[in-house]
Amino acid sequence: EKYGVEPTYANMREGWMYHIRDRVWLANRAALGLMHLGFTPPFTGDENLNPHWYQIDPQLINEIWAYTAPGMISYAAGKSDWAARITSDSWAVSPTVLYGAMYADAFFCKDIRKLITRALRELPADDRYAIAVKEMIALYDKYPKDWVKARQIMAKKYYIDEPAMTKTIWNANLNGLCGILAMLYGEGDFQRTLDLSCAMGFDCDNQAATISGLLGVMYGAKSLPESLTKPIEGWEKPFNDRYINITRFDIPDASIEDMIERTYNKAIELVCSKGGKVKGDMVYVNPKAQFIPPMEFCIGPNPDLEIGQPTDYSFACRTNADFKWELVKGKLPAGVTFQNGKLAGTPTEAGKYPITLQLSAN
């Protein structure tokens, strides 16, 4: 609402630094620390800078990028990739991309297996998580009535035998696979899927929340058991229609119905901005919409060159590398060139070399 339906990384950094002050862990905490050092995403999630780049973090806060883009599967996947890189990198981004695609598709697809396989189109065939998801589907086919066996095999390969560097209960790949198994063995039943999400273990509360939300989109609010949405006598609306904030600075308590209405309005705004339209009580979406990251400079470590040592420093990152980069002011050290947002060559002279760069659309 404050920054529009396609915020910039600079906007995200500003919001994070203002609202997130405590109760933050792992990749989120490391990213926030890097923001306070002056960095912007995606450098805050870079595997060379964020020691927790491989953790689950972006899967937990991803839904909004997708349920505001109903039916716009590729758009939701691309935006999820962009957002995940605030905290994460490499294969740890992939579960977030898959969830993003599934959330967007869930408005129209009611078949669990089809939902998963269609979302896999948004990941490269050789992606680590994509390969592992296909393994989970094969396990389900082999042991359709034995989720314990499937979970045992999955945990052996992706937790017990995981390389020491990335072996944690919060590993993004591991927990993303737990979610897939819960979906497959839950077979569309909300309570069973929720129970299985918890039974899979590891960082299970987060998988339970993500998968439960996904089923809610697929089958609607009426599919949710009242024993869960109205557990206290006297509640007339789900969860008593109250969101109570206890963890984020200067975020007010709110009516859940009001939050839904505001989110719906943002979804309509986004749909219409990407070629969709509203006609009467019907909303038409553009399923071919693509997410193009906002054009912006992203701030990472300053270049630190050494005489006689080759450099390949890049000001450009994956979200702005395709724009036009120009050196418009200043002088480079002898032996160094600038092209496509990158420094290359071997400096031969010491000194300070202030430069001004310009970024524009091609």
Question: Model segments located where?
Answer:
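Acidic, carboxylate-rich catalytic segments that either coordinate divalent cations
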Residues: 126, 130-165, 221-296
